[in-house]
C-alpha cells in the first residue's frame, strides 16, 4: 500500500504486504484460521524508492512497526505487538523480523482484521519523520 511520501522520482515509501504464520507444529488449515490460545506471528515488508532512497537509508533511521487487530463484530481490538529496527546503507527493501503474538487478548472466537502502521524516525525520542505507511493485512479467524 502506498505510504507517504509519494514524490516520484525523488522519494517513495511503500508497505507491501502483511503475513501471518502459526508457531509450533505444521498444520493443514490455512494460517488465517488459528485455534484459540495458539500463538501466531505477524510480519510485513516495506520499501523505499526514488533517487533519494539510497541516501536516506544510509542515515541509519529508526523504523517503528506496530501491529493491530480489530474484531469484525463484538470482540477484542488493540495492539498485538511491535517491532523496531534501523535502516541500513544500501538496503532499500525490508522484511520485518516476525513478531510473536500472544492471543491472550483475543479471548473470543471470531473474525478479526489485522493492520500494521510503520513510521520512520530518528530515534525513540521525538516525533517521527513525515515517512509513514500502513497496510491492512489478512483477516484471521480465531476458532
Where are these regions (language model features)?
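Internal, hydrophobic beta-strand segments that form the core of beta-sheet-rich folds
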Residues: 40-45, 61-70, 95-141
Amino acid at each position: 500500500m502506498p505510504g507517504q511520501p509519494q514524490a516520484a522520482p525523488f522519494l517513495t515509501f511503500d508497505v507491501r504486504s502483511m503475513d501471518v504464520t502459526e508457531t509450533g507444529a505444521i498444520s493443514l488449515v490455512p494460517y488465517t484460521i488459528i485455534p484459540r490460545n495458539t500463538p501466531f506471528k505477524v510480519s510485513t515488508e516495506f520499501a523505499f524508492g526514488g533517487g533519494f532512497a539510497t541516501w536516506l537509508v544510509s542515515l541509519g533511521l529508526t523504523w517503528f512497526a506496530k501491529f493491530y487487530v480489530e474484531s469484525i463484530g463484538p470482540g477484542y481490538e488493540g495492539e498485538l505487538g511491535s517491532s523496531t529496527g534501523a535502516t541500513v546503507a544500501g538496503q532499500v527493501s525490508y522484511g520485518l523480523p516476525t513478531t510473536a503474538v500472544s492471543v491472550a487478548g483475543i479471548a473470543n472466537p471470531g473474525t478479526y482484521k489485522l493492520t500494521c502502521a510503520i513510521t520512520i524516525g530518528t530515534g525513540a525520542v521525538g516525533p517521527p519523520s513525515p515517512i509513514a505507511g500502513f497496510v491492512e493485512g489478512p483477516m484471521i479467524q480465531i476458532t
